[in-house]
Design a protein with these regions (language model features):
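Terminal accessory carbohydrate-recognition/targeting modules of carbohydrate-active enzymes
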Residues: 1-249
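Substrate-binding groove/exosite segments of carbohydrate-active enzymes
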Residues: 225-301
Length: 301
């Protein structure tokens, strides 16, 4: 129901009464995938990585991470093929090509339940040769050249908690405060790699476990990491939400949408102190962030 492709909705449509226009079309730019505390307050899908304003309960003002592609030391300008854009509540995918269309990058990105931001990249070259990926994150910049990980420390809004970001990728090593990896491609034979930024919080020990499984554990494989995150998300619905089917499709659609909206607005940060120590709903999570105290009992239950 929540799947979207391309840049729809784009503000126009057609029904029995004819063509119509409406305001507020988002062009499929907001990222539906989110963690129990982390999400993209704003999202720039036409750039590789998690570009936009990352939120951890609220805005941080930072990108998650950016990714550059270069060939022979020459940075490539990539353009998104928006027709390839597809989004579901558990992942977002799109495709990029360089100017002469010799390089294609298919990106699949998602945020795990415990706030690990993961991007899988499948890269194809029509000519073969070396392709270098360089990734940078304002959250994690500490590490010596040759290390396999960058780290950092960040106090979230109002100093409600501190997160300890960890940033790594398959075959990536630290160079000048960034992560870099060079892939040697055969012509028209795709290779897949991935990057992960874990927004680690001491009060959420699973955030460390989920990150380390992707860093050097049993989910280092991009396909395994993706499958684990998507099936975990889908299983949450099976375990927590009753299935509703009526004779009226519009009723079903409304019920599904409201359940999804409640899930998207849910904050389960387990923060210390008398702030967000319990699950709650943040009404308008991409807007005015009004906590609905009335629903706390329901979410705790």
């Amino acid at each position: 129901f929540r799947s979207r492709t391309g840049t729809a909705p784009n503000g126009t449509g057609t029904n029995d009464a004819g063509d119509y226009n409406y305001a507020g079309a988002d062009k499929n730019e907001y990222l539906f995938s989110r963690g129990r505390a982390a999400f993209m307050y704003t999202h720039t899908p036409e750039a590789l990585g998690f570009v936009g304003d990352v939120a951890y309960w609220d805005q941080t003002g930072n990108d998650g991470f950016t990714v550059e592609v270069s060939i022979g030391g020459s940075k490539q300008t990539l353009r998104e093929n928006t027709d390839k854009r597809k989004q579901t509540p558990s992942y977002f995918t799109t495709e990029f090509t360089n100017g002469d269309k010799t390089i294609t990058v298919t990106e699949v990105k998602y945020i795990t339940y415990t706030n690990v931001m993961v991007a899988n990249f499948t890269i194809t070259s029509t000519t073969g040769g070396d392709v270098t990926l360089t990734a940078a994150s304002p959250f994690a910049q500490d590490g010596n050249d040759g290390d396999t990980e960058l780290t950092g420390r960040f106090n979230v809004k109002n100093d409600l908690t501190t997160i300890y970001p960890r940033f790594s990728g398959n075959g990536f090593t630290v160079k000048n405060g960034k992560l870099a990896s060079t892939l040697t491609l055969e012509a028209n034979v795709p290779q897949t790699t991935k990057l992960q930024l874990g927004l680690i919080a001491n009060e959420l020990p699973d955030s460390t476990a989920e990150y380390e499984a992707r860093f050097n554990g049993d989910l280092t494989d991009p396909a395994a990491s993706y499958k684990d995150s998507v099936t975990t998300y889908n299983r949450w619905w099976v375990d927590n939400i009753p299935y509703v089917e009526t004779q009226e499709h519009n009723i079903d659609k409304t019920v599904f949408y409201r359940w999804w909206l409640s899930r998207f607005n849910m904050l389960d940060a387990n923060m210390p102190g008398n702030t967000f120590q319990y699950p709650t709903s943040i009404e308008g999570v991409l807007g005015y962030n009004n906590q609905i105290v009335l629903t706390s009992g329901m979410f705790i239950n």
